[in-house]
Structures are given as C-alpha cells and as structure tokens.
Amino acid sequence: MGRLSSTLCLTFLILATVAFGVPPKKSINVPFGRNYFPTWAFDHIKYLNGGSEVHLVLDKYTGTGFQSKGSYLFGHFSMHIKMVAGDSAGTVTAFYLSSQNSEHDEIDFEFLGNRTGQPYILQTNVFTGGAGNREQRINLWFDPSKDYHSYSVLWNMYQIVFFVDDVPIRVFKNSKDVGVKFPFNQPMKIYSSLWNADDWATRGGLEKTNWEKAPFVASYRGFHVDGCEASVNAKFCETQGKRWWDQKEFQDLDANQYKRLKWVRKRYTIYNYCTDRVRFPVPPPECRRDRDI
C-alpha cells in the first residue's frame, strides 16, 4: 500500500507539472541588506524582523526608494509586496529594472493606487534603447493590499515575462529579426520606490492624493536576487546558456501558460498599446509575436 501511495503521489506531481507549466524557481528569503540599499529619504524606510521585511513610507514631504547593489544581465527577479491599503489614490509603488545611460533599457511594474473600494491598476512597460511607449494595464484579480503577493520578471535572451504569483501577465519576445530592439547587452540594476504621482496616476490625474490618509506604507519581503551579476560596462553574461533561466523550458511559454495569459488578457486587461489604433494605426511588429493582437 505504501509503494502504491508513493507511486500515485509521484504521478500526481508529474501531471500537475504538465498541467500548470514550469514555474520560475522560488526565491530564497534573505535580509534586505544582502542585495539592496536605500537611495533617498533614508528615514522613510523602516526595517523589521532583522531586515527580512521593509516598509516604504510616503507622506506629504517625500516618498522613498531603494536599489540593488549589483547590476545584472538576465535572470529571475522577484519581490513580495503588500501594497498601500485603503485610499491610495495618487500613489505609485514601482518595482523595475533599468540600465544607467541615455539609451537605457527598462522593465517596469508600476502599481497605481486608487480610491477605497476601487481596484489597483498594474501598469507594465518595456524600454529598449531609450524608447518605451509600450504600456499595458490590468486590474488585479485580488486586493494587493491585503497580503503579500509575488511580482517577478524572467529575462533571458529569448523573452521577458512578467509574472504575478507565477501567472504570466505579459510577454515581450526577442524580435530583433523584425527590427525591434531587445535588452541584451546593458546590465540593469533593480529599483523600487513609493512616491506621489497624483498628476497622472489615478484617472489621469483627476483623483488627487488625500494627505489626511498619510502616511502611506508599502511592505516588502523576499530580497533574493537570482541573476547574472555583471559590471555596468559588461556586454555579455559569462554564464550565458548555463543558468536555469536559459534552458529550453524557459525560452517560451508552454500551452498552459499561454492559456493563463489569455485569461488575463480577456478578463483583466484594460489597456494594451498593441490594440490602440489611435496611437499606433499600424500595430508595432512585436505585438503579433507576443500574441497581443
């Protein structure tokens, strides 16, 4: 009976892996100071539990932020965040990667606060060679202020995938063969910040920050970085092709992951530059490859 139970359990695990796709590797809990340091308004960052948890605080005087100590070419970058609760209109919590030059590459998560009872909006964007204008917006299918959720980026030579709790919400494929630049030779640092953006963040700036609700707090956990660390001037990753994120199963989404992406597209997407015919009468070439049109 014991051997039969073990066999059934193993079979279930194999079938579950096939059914739900291959998720990125889970991050390891390490303290904030291992990989990050504050960059401004140091007194607005609070450290808890030996640095395993960090709170960013925004008031009417300033927000705050932090960045990674290292720069990275490819990897899996995640953060567990609990967003500002209650009336968060006008606030933006950002988690992103960016290189440090004028023709920079950038991969963005921006969480746009809202009035109490209204959904948070998650805006993503990708900059290549200094050019962005690739905004996509979704409503999250949960309240991100109630608990910690994982937000992550898988970046390799083949694709950039945005995940929310291991659900792919966006893909940006390497489309250099059709003339679209792709981030591949500019190391990026990891950044996060909480700041006031009530000139645009909520309903295009119509909803202003209610400072009577301050201070606003965004909470963070999970400061492990799983990336190819490189100097800011490096042009390639020395371990290219050898890390888990380079392997075949991470070079494209599988059928089930595309199904989940389609679910997000159908039920939660509220803006997609790929389908905006006012801004782009002819869809950008990457959109068809990314299955966004």
Curated annotation (Swiss-Prot):
Please give the biological process terms from Gene Ontology that the record holds.
Answer: cell wall biogenesis; cell wall organization; xyloglucan metabolic process
* Subcellular location field: Secreted, Cell wall; Secreted, Extracellular space, Apoplast
Specify the domain of life of the species encoding this protein: Eukaryota
Keyword terms of this UniProt record: Apoplast, Cell wall, Cell wall biogenesis/degradation, Disulfide bond, Glycoprotein, Glycosidase, Hydrolase, Secreted, Signal, Transferase
PTM per Swiss-Prot/TrEMBL? Contains at least one intrachain disulfide bond essential for its enzymatic activity.
Any idea what job this protein has?
Answer: Catalyzes xyloglucan endohydrolysis (XEH) and/or endotransglycosylation (XET). Cleaves and religates xyloglucan polymers, an essential constituent of the primary cell wall, and thereby participates in cell wall construction of growing tissues.
Name of the protein: Probable xyloglucan endotransglucosylase/hydrolase protein 5
Native source species? Arabidopsis thaliana
